Amino acid sequence: MNVYGFNAKSITGEDTFLEDYKGKVILIVNTASKCGFTAQFEGLEKLYEKYKDQFVILGFPSNQFRGQDPGTNAEIQNFCLLNFGVSFPLFERVDVRGENSHPLFDYLTNAKPFKGFNLDDELESKFYNITKEEYPEFLDDDSIKWNFTKFLISKEGKVIERYDSWVTPEEIEKDIVKLL
């Protein structure tokens, strides 16, 4: 199986099939507009603009982590456009973990499980402590831990890599280029 079997509603409510992106490298990201990682939109947009002939970013807003994307779909779209010039495709807000998780995210997290926290890294250690305090049940599974988790997909629709929130778009660029 690959990601091409999934569909989702665009941020404007239109049915979108991931097979429409066949032949492009894809980066799927769960996003939020009120998160400490929200500034990553800038780096994501730069990557998209640089490689958009062969590459696409698909942004899926989620409100599951500290309620950091509470707006309507229109508000989310306007925020992304006005603050970061986001031109890559955005989708309706979805759950990315738990019993109401969008099937695409179930597939992605099964294909690339969570690698664990590197407690020697200051930022990862901080997120481990936040997770332990606020969402201890998250430590027991491979699901998404926070906003801006990213999944890199090959031109054939295969899940190649998972990058957690603290990995910046700039750090991912070399892996994207290898797949172009």
What are the residue ranges of the model-derived segments?
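N-terminal "domain-start" segment that seeds a small globular fold
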Residues: M1-E19
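Short loop/turn microsegments at loop-to-beta-strand junctions
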Residues: V3-Y4, I26, N147-T149
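Conserved helix-turn-beta segment immediately C-terminal to the redox Cys motif
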Residues: G23-I26, S33-K34, T38-P61, R66, ...
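Thiol-based oxidoreductase modules, predominantly thioredoxin-like and allied folds used
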Residues: Q54-T72, S87-G98
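Thiol/selenol-based redox catalytic cores and closely related redox-interacting motifs
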Residues: F79-L81, G85-V167
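Non-catalytic, surface beta->alpha helical segment in thiol-disulfide oxidoreductase systems
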Residues: I160-L180
